[in-house]
């Protein structure tokens, strides 16, 4: 009887320890922290995340351009090439890139590693890490 009580206590203790471990806990980031203009470190590449609201709901769009290639934000046709729909769920950032020439939209999925009010770090499926700094007031 005494051995049974000790075994039950041991199993309960191990269960409590395992349940309290945070191993495997996936970080969760907030979409609002993503809003705004970001510049990729060491490059003239930019990405802007927006959320637009109308009577039917909130639409999340973004756009990206590279001034090093002679393209500015004003060169982009709204909701055309260079634009994407986006969503952030926990650490998974999904961008659906829009093709204005009638081609199929292109999905891209990233894993956000860090997101603060000034820094964004994400990784693509090929393990390429992209690091951005938020442009203040833009």
What are the functions of these language-model segments?
Residues 17-20:
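C-terminal motif of bacterial Sec signal peptides marking the signal peptidase cleavage site
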């Amino acid at each position: 009887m005494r051995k049974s009580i000790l075994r039950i206590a041991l199993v309960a203790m191990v269960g409590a320890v395992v349940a309290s471990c945070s191993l495997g806990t996936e970080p969760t980031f907030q979409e609002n922290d993503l809003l705004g203009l970001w510049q990729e470190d060491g490059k003239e590449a930019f990405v802007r995340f927006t959320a637009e609201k109308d009577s039917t709901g909130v639409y999340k769009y973004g756009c990206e351009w590279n001034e090093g290639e002679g393209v500015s934000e004003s060169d982009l046709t709204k909701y055309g090439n260079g634009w994407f729909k986006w969503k952030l769920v926990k650490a998974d950032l999904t961008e659906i890139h829009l093709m204005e020439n009638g081609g199929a939209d292109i999905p891209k999925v990233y894993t956000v590693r860090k997101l603060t009010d000034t820094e964004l770090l994400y990784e693509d499926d090929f393990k390429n890490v992209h690091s951005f700094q938020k442009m203040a007031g833009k």
